[in-house]
Amino acid sequence: MISGAGAVGRHLASDLANRGHNVTLIEQDPAVLEIAKEWAPQVDHMIGDACEPWVLEKAQLNTADVVVASTGDDEDNLVTALLAKQEFGVPRVLARVNHPDNEWLFTEQWGVDAAVSPPHILTAMV
């Protein structure tokens, strides 16, 4: 399951689906979800807020092997990660860190197995 159907989420969803993975993409903005449907028609699309437990239950998160919280909002990504790990027992949870100052929060205590911080990755590559 991937939360956030912006550029990062929809590209990731498409790539994973093309590699044979079953992917559910959750997005709360209908306009953004419509773009994702065109970009990645081979994945399941769901309108909703991934910070809401009932949305994750409807997405059958308890059967997911991996969750990627890829929204542009760090708080939302942390809430989604924590719910995925604590409430639904997802084995592997990855989260996008949008603001480097928040990276210290993205730990196993918050349900995050691996945090991805694009600014730090780019800095490390220079």
Specify the residue positions occupied by each region the protein language model found.
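Cytosolic regulatory regions of ion transport systems
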Residues: M1-V126
